[in-house]
Amino acid sequence: MIPEKRIIRRIQSGGCAIHCQDCSISQLCIPFTLNEHELDQLDNIIERKKPIQKGQTLFKAGDELKSLYAIRSGTIKSYTITEQGDEQITGFHLAGDLVGFDAIGSGHHPSFAQALETSMVCEIPFETLDDLSGKMPNLRQQMMRLMSGEIKGDQDMILLLSKKNAEERLAAFIYNLSRRFAQRGFSPREFRLTMTRGDIGNYLGLTVETISRLLGRFQKSGMLAVKGKYITIENSDALAALAGHTRNVA
């Protein structure tokens, strides 16, 4: 569980903002491992935006990389458009995640980032961040850790799509989502899916009908309870086993 922190609101242009020192998800984000002086320097370059409404985009494919975005609340999906003009979802980003890493190599975003619900983000100008990280080893190391985590996630996704059947894919998706909620201090057993079943199917390479059928099967087996977008994990051992993990949902 992420310990509760006293939230200090300071007036900025545009209203109230939570600073890095007071953010409850800082352990998952860039500020982790930074000392107070380093936090102050990072805090000074961050722009805190107004809420992003459902359906709005942070950036589009082809846009020049100007900033990275740290999600404070809400859910952002990343997707590309195939040669056939179809949407292909490549990731779902939760509070504490950083969006935009995949643009560092070319200097342009290869994908779109769109809010699935009302979300709050911190905008971090990349050139300034890159310059600052050159002067702060702790910041540079944390950036590398975050990028390494994203690469590991991509590798896991390749394995998921190439080696697992439909049941195992969906079980792994729900299991991994529950672990991510746990890391953020939320319940790993009861949560709301912010993405549609169509989005989940798109991400996993399955049809909407297959997702609905499998959720019904998981519920009938007693592994899950499903009510609309709300999921309750009833048998964490069974879910972990089907997902290819041995540890219980914490």
Swiss-Prot record:
Positions of the HTH crp-type domain: 164-237
Compartment(s) where it occurs, according to its Swiss-Prot or TrEMBL record: Cytoplasm
Region annotation Activating region 1C: where it falls in the sequence: 181-191
Chain spans, region Activating region 3D: 112
Region (Activating region 2C): 127-128
Source organism: Salmonella typhimurium (strain LT2 / SGSC1412 / ATCC 700720)
Protein name according to UniProt: Fumarate and nitrate reduction regulatory protein
Region (Essential for the oxygen-regulated activity): 20-29
Residues given in the record as [4Fe-4S] cluster binding sites: C20, C23, C29, C122
PANTHER family tied to this protein: CRP FAMILY TRANSCRIPTIONAL REGULATORY PROTEIN (PTHR24567), FUMARATE AND NITRATE REDUCTION REGULATORY PROTEIN (PTHR24567:SF75)
BP GO annotations: positive regulation of DNA-templated transcription
UniProt-annotated stretches for the region Activating region 3C: 85-87
Residue ranges of the region described as Dimerization: 140-159
Entry keyword Nucleotide-binding: no
Complexes and interactors: Homodimer.
Cofactor(s) demanded: [4Fe-4S] cluster
Predominant localisation class: cytoplasm
Region listing for Activating region 1A, in residue ranges: 71-75
